């Protein structure tokens, strides 16, 4: 079981390095793979930082998100937090659903970046 978990984490880590991330006009936010189930985004912190429940400093995270741009709502489905060396710090799933984002937050920047990207592809 431990070997399977290690293989899974290595696959996620290598996927974060191999993805083609498109920079958005919002600092630190990059757009990745777009699917019918959501959009993968990457957020890079200006400086590595500690997160609650993490086991080290985080340099960036990758999240699968769904957006409701018409109503300014974002659903963060899953987050994977990484250290600078690419090792996984924490994986979180969020069964909450769509929510308003706090003004001037990372979530609001992600929502704006995703909605801007989606409107440019219409």
What are these model-predicted stretches?
Residues 17-122:
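N-terminal secretory-pathway/extracellular module detecting exported/lumenal segments
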